[in-house]
Amino acid sequence: MNQEDPKKFGLYIHVPFCSRRCDYCSFATWTDREHLIDQYLTACKTQAATWTPELPVITSIFIGGGTPNLVPAELLMDVVADLPIATDSEFTVECNPDLVSSDQLETYVHAGVNRISLGVQSMVPHVLASLGREHDPTNVQSAVKKIRSAGISNINFDLIYGAQGETNEDWQTSLEKALSLEPNHLSTYALTVEPGTPLATDIERHPDDDDQADKYIQANRLLTGAGYSNYEISNWAQPDKESRHNLLYWNQGEYLGLGVAAHSHIGQKRFWSVRTPERFISAISKNSSVEAGSEQLDVEGWALEGRQLALRTSSGVPEEFIPHEVRHLTQPADLDGNLKLTAEGRLLANEVAVRLR
């Protein structure tokens, strides 16, 4: 049974187009497929239409990528135009700060977008260069101003730590400059080496585990001190500004994914789509399935997964499921009898998760 409120249902749309592929990126994205944008978004709309009769009211939408604000805003918003969306839904579009424009935002707002997630990554130029990012950190402030002027007050910053050459002082600078712009939510991710990426073959740029651990603690100290709650390992939010869409994932809620490589979870079945735009467009045009694979957890596996996900959040896990040998990584049980990881314990969350009963 879903832990999340059954009345909540999410929608994810994947936009696999980028002007440049970041060195650490392993997502389904392409820099040489812009000629397919119109066909792709039309295919996404067709895919959405096939699901519409079965869909409950959608309470959260997240459009990610890739670079969603690289594609024409009108075409992107048309994908969701006929879907049953709640009037109080959380509707997020992921954006590259360099590409944010007032006209684009006006179209988003007209379609119901009320949250923007900016791919900031760092506020220090040489760190961005190390990550293979191309945007100018000074454009973040300009983007935030445009977003707020358009009437969107709910803003998230994505940040990455652990790049080659990033000192603790650089990370502090990124955090402080980010906080000065007063986002409602920050997601901070340790740089991860994924197979097949340029970063994977460049050993000198691989992150150091101890350095990343120090930077996580540094971020937690600064962000919690600034009034943000660490409600999930990598996420901090101002009061009542937690990402409702992300909470749906962590609480095993249901959602539909549209587009290439998009994952869905309906009932207790998870399934995902083909990975390339060409295969996706072709399958949709032939009225064929775009499903590339699926899985279905049994009752025991479902319950264990729920506890492993809850361990990542501020909800915690009932005390009886956490072995004594790892309880030194948790805070004292709360009034509900749940144990929550300490900041240091969150660094070892994966190790604790595999020991859950």
Task: Tell what function each PLM region has.
Residues 14-29:
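Local cysteine-cluster metal-coordination motifs and their immediate loop/turn environment
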Residues 344-357:
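Short, amphipathic alpha-helical interaction segments positioned at domain boundaries
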Residues 6-10, 30-51, 57-321:
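C-terminal scaffold of the Radical SAM
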Residues 18, 184, 254, 337-339:
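Beta-strand-connecting loop/turn residues
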Residues 330-338:
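A short, conserved structural fragment
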Residues 321-331:
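Short amphipathic alpha-helical interaction segments
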Residues 1-5:
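A short beta-strand-turn-helix
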Residues 15, 95, 341-342:
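Hydrophobic residues in beta-strands and at strand termini
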